[in-house]
C-alpha cells in the first residue's frame, strides 16, 4: 500500500466547480460552463497521472491511500475519512472523468440556449464529484456519502427543467425509488458494524472469516438490493425510463 497526497484533487476539483457556480450566481453565467468543463478535464488529468504512477510500481504496491481526517471517534468505534485507489477504482475514475468531460463538452453547445446553463453545469460537476467519492471512499460510510450525493445530483439533473410538471414528477420518482436501494445499503452498513465492529473495506475483509454465515448472507442481500436500486435492475427499474425526461446529456451521464 502506497500513500498519496493527490487523490483528494480528483474529487476536490469538480466539487469546487459546483460550489463556485452555485455560489457565484449570475456573475459566472458567461464562463461558468467553461470552468466546469476545465475542472472535469483536470480531474481526468489527475487520474491519468495516478495511473502512470501506479503502472510504475509492483502489483502489491499499486493500491494508493490517503487519510483526510478523523471523521468519527465514539468509544471504540473510529472511522477516518480516507480515499483508496487501486487497479479497479482507477478504471472507474478514468471512465467517470473521461466520459464526464466529453458530456460537459457536448453540453456547452446543447445547453447554449438555456438561460440557466450555469446551474446545469454546477449539477454536472456535483454528479462527477459524488461518483468519484463513491468509487474512491475507503469505507462503507464514505461510499454511502458518495452514493447519496449521486442520488441528489441525479434528482437535480433529471428535474432540471422543473417548470414542466412531467419532468418534475420524473425526478421525484427516481429519487423515491432509489431510496429503496439506499435503505439496503444503510442496513448492510449496520450489519457490518453490529457483527464486525468496523465499516472500513479492509476491516470488513479481515473479519469475514470470523462472521456468521447468516450475517454475511444478510449483508450480501442488502448490498444486492442497493445495487438493484441504483442500477435500475428488476424490480426497481421503473424509474429509469422516466429519467430520460431530463436534458439529453443527463441521459448519457446516468
What kind of region is each of these model predictions?
Residues 1-254:
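...captures the hydrophobic TM-helix bundle architecture rather than a specific catalytic motif
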Amino acid at each position: 500500500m502506497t500513500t498519496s497526497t493527490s487523490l483528494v484533487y480528483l474529487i476536490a476539483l469538480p466539487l469546487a466547480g459546483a460550489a463556485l457556480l452555485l455560489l457565484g450566481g449570475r456573475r459566472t453565467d458567461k464562463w461558468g460552463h467553461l470552468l466546469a468543463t476545465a475542472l472535469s478535464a483536470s480531474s481526468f488529468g489527475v487520474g491519468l497521472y495516478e495511473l502512470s504512477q501506479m503502472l510504475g510500481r509492483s502489483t502489491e504496491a499499486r493500491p494508493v491511500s490517503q487519510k483526510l481526517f478523523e471523521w468519527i471517534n465514539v468509544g471504540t468505534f473510529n472511522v477516518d475519512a480516507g480515499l483508496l485507489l487501486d487497479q479497479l477504482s482507477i478504471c472507474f475514475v478514468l471512465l467517470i472523468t473521461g466520459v464526464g468531460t466529453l458530456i460537459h463538452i457536448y453540453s456547452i453547445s446543447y445547453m447554449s440556449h438555456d438561460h440557466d446553463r450555469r446551474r446545469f453545469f454546477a449539477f454536472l460537476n456535483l454528479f462527477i464529484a459524488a461518483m468519484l467519492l463513491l468509487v474512491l471512499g475507503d469505507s462503507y460510510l464514505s461510499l454511502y456519502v458518495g452514493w447519496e450525493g449521486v442520488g441528489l445530483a441525479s434528482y437535480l439533473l433529471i428535474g432540471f427543467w422543473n417548470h414542466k410538471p412531467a419532468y418534475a414528477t420524473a425526478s421525484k420518482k427516481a429519487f423515491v425509488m432509489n431510496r429503496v436501494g439506499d435503505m439496503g445499503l444503510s442496513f448492510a452498513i449496520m450489519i457490518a458494524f453490529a457483527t464486525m465492529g468496523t465499516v472500513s473495506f479492509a476491516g470488513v475483509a479481515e473479519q469475514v472469516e470470523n462472521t456468521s454465515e447468516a450475517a454475511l448472507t444478510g449483508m450480501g442481500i442488502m448490498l444486492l438490493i442497493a445495487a438493484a436500486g441504483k442500477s435500475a435492475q428488476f424490480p426497481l427499474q421503473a424509474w429509469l425510463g422516466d429519467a430520460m425526461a431530463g436534458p439529453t446529456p443527463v441521459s448519457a451521464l446516468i
